[in-house]
Amino acid sequence: MKLYSVSIIIFVLIALSTIVNAQQAATDSCNSTLPLNDLTFNTSLLQCTEAWTPQNFILRYARTAENTWSFILSAPDSSAFIGIGFSTNGQMIGSSAIVGWIPSDGGSGTVKPYLLGGKSPGEVNPDQGDLTIVNGSLKIESVSSRLYMRFQLTATLPRQSLLYAVGPAGFFPSSPDFRLREHRFVTTTTINYNTGSQSVVKVSPHSKLKKTHGLMNMFGWGILIIVGAIVARHMKQWDPTWFYAHIALQTTGFLLGLTGVICGLVLENRLKANNVSKHKGLGITILVMGVLQMLALLARPDKQSKYRKYWNWYHHNIGRLLIILAISNIFYGIHLAKAGTSWNGGYGFAVAVLALTAIGLEVRKFLKK
């Protein structure tokens, strides 16, 4: 019995020791010895910084030759790709990145440069970007459950806004396209290459306001107003239901659009944006036309009035012009915000559905004559 108890205790101690050793092996710090032996530059020059504490990213770097910067990024091997991006403004779009991974099946590691052209996977292009990489310097290896990705850049001073990312667990890019999937975790920092100090860049406090501005205008001016116009043109056989539906849709669309315009004005004031004058001008024009359309309801002549045909001409054509300007300005706003293909594709699909519906109803109306 005593022998059995002693055996259990020894087993537990060995298990605990194994767990502790594994945790220590998967952890790196600036005080740790770099476990790489085949480096072609003087490692004593390397500066070290805890790049991303929650993910235990450690970045070592140095200017190891004239206009040559050597980097070693280490991170836990979580069966996912790791990446570091170099940005001019702290934003993902337009940045260039170095991404590396080692497949769980024991395959060889891969490191590739990527151009972060947008937020969707299709806009993140391998073997592109504006980083000048020293030939043969891209390499990644796994040591004690930890990835060490190294590369060298030719630059007077690399960009100081750095992006770090961890890919989805179990996914590894593969040939022929080497497309990445959306990362699980991401952060943005700024680094002082002289001191090694890094600071995390907080997410813009205006991101929610931007999204609200876009969605309100998109659903208000860009969808509901169009649906209301379709109802008024093609549903008159259901009188007076069509009229009340038309009023409800246009009023709701106007209120959403008004909210979107107000959000846009607040956003412009907070961001001190200087490249939105055309977008703002179109938005205010659309709002004025919307107000005129709402006021037109109060001045609507009777059907028997000789002025009714002029009112109809005004109401219909101002409405058509409003819709054209609204669609154009929404796409222009998406372009200014660099929102990517998801917004363009989503709204483009909605407009296409509405256009096909309107065309189909027009054809049916023509055939009935």
Curated annotation (Swiss-Prot):
Alphabetical keyword list: Electron transport, Heme, Iron, Membrane, Metal-binding, Signal, Transmembrane, Transmembrane helix, Transport
PROSITE patterns registered for this protein in UniProt: CYTOCHROME_B561 (PS50939), DOMON (PS50836)
Subcellular location: Membrane
Record-annotated membrane-spanning stretches: 212-232, 247-267, 279-299, 321-341, 343-363
Keyword flag Iron: yes
One protein family per Pfam: Cytochrom_B561
Gene Ontology cellular-component annotations: membrane
Signal peptide (residue range): 1-22
Needed co-factor(s): heme b
Stored SMART domains: B561, DoH
MF (Gene Ontology): metal ion binding
Cofactor, free-text remark: Binds 2 heme b groups non-covalently.
Residues binding heme b 2, per UniProt: H246, H315
Highest taxon of source: Eukaryota
Domain Cytochrome b561: 174-369
Domain spans labelled DOMON: 55-167
Record has Hydrolase as a keyword: no
Matches recorded under InterPro entries: Cyt_b561/ferric_Rdtase_TM, DOH_DOMON, DOMON_domain, UCP037471
Membrane association type: Multi-pass membrane protein
Domain notes: DOMON domain could bind catecholamines and thereby could regulate the cytochrome b561 domain function. DOMON domain could bind one heme b.
Function: May act as a catecholamine-responsive trans-membrane electron transporter.
Protein name (database record): Cytochrome b561 and DOMON domain-containing protein At3g07570
Organism of this sequence: Arabidopsis thaliana (Mouse-ear cress)
